[in-house]
Amino acid sequence: MQTQIGAPKQKLSFSDPKVRAWLFQIITIVAVVSLGWYLFHNTQTNMQHRGITSGFDFLERSAGFGIAQHLIDYTESDSYARVFVIGLLNTLLVSVIGVVLATLLGFIIGVARLSPNWMINKLATVYVEVFRNIPPLLQILFWYFAVFLTMPLPRNSHNFGDTFFMSSRGLNMPAALASEGFWPFVASIVIAIVAVVLMTRWANKRFEATGVPFHKFWAGLALLIVIPALCTLVFGAPLHWEMPRLAGFNFVGGWVLIPELLALTLALTVYTAAFIAEIVRSGIQSVSHGQTEAAHSLGMRPGPTLRKVIIPQALRVIIPPLTSQYLNLAKNSSLAAGIGYPEMVSLFAGTVLNQTGQAIEVIAITMSVYLAISISISLLMNWYNKRIALIER
């Protein structure tokens, strides 16, 4: 008769790493849940004592205040929801313009930092060392108070060809207004783009089959010019221009870029471009010098060598840190509250919050907006980074 003896049961002991791991995780979860419940209960209690009701119904109330700049129609009787949309559009406007201008200026300064010309090299170096070491808020305040607010009044504004007028009220310029032929013109642009894509595919297949090249650039350019031009001849001009004119103490008609927008955009562009310049410089220097020598040995001049050989390879190094600078620029747009530009923070998290008292809802919406903008920029740049990544076989 055989007796089977099972393995002895292990007792739970604090010295067992698995027991400690489970215990610490349980304690952490309980602590986080308890803290969350305390904050929620405390917030609800304080709001009840102050007579504040939670929820997003306040977005339907009338705002009752004016906004200096709005990209869509707005009156003081419109709702807080429309104020939110205006703040969002103004934030996106500054971010998009700033990203484009900072990228262009940053690339120019970055290439200038590597110029063999002593004067250009030193000027670019001074630019980088000065502007990247001054806080962006101080730069915004400088451009606003020391530059744009010191401009003359509209009656004595700087006149540029009776078309552009620069004064302390901002930059007045002609406005492009849609005419009857606008939508047919838009349709013609879409048709031209589709035609260019189809032509490019056909040309590539033809080249692979016969080896005979096709002038895709000139053919595509002709399509983009001829099709919209024919549409304009048939349906008329897509736009007509409204010129600004002085009436009383200010200009009427046309578009106006308010001083707050000009100061914010210029400051963020100059500040961010200094960092982008260093990213571009380091990216170019990361490319082996042998690539430059090989291009020169083929008879390529320095300009085409930089555009067609060096920059495409340097982009793989430039794009990741460039993404961070785009994110910083979008988030730094919130500094506009310092000069009263009506973007998300100053307009929605400032004026709307003060009038409604819905602090939790307003701040949550504002944080969600900046989070969505940052994630969108990251996804777009990551997608582009994968497109240009070096594929090894």
Predicted segments — roles?
Residues 2-393:
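Transmembrane alpha-helices and adjacent helix-loop boundaries
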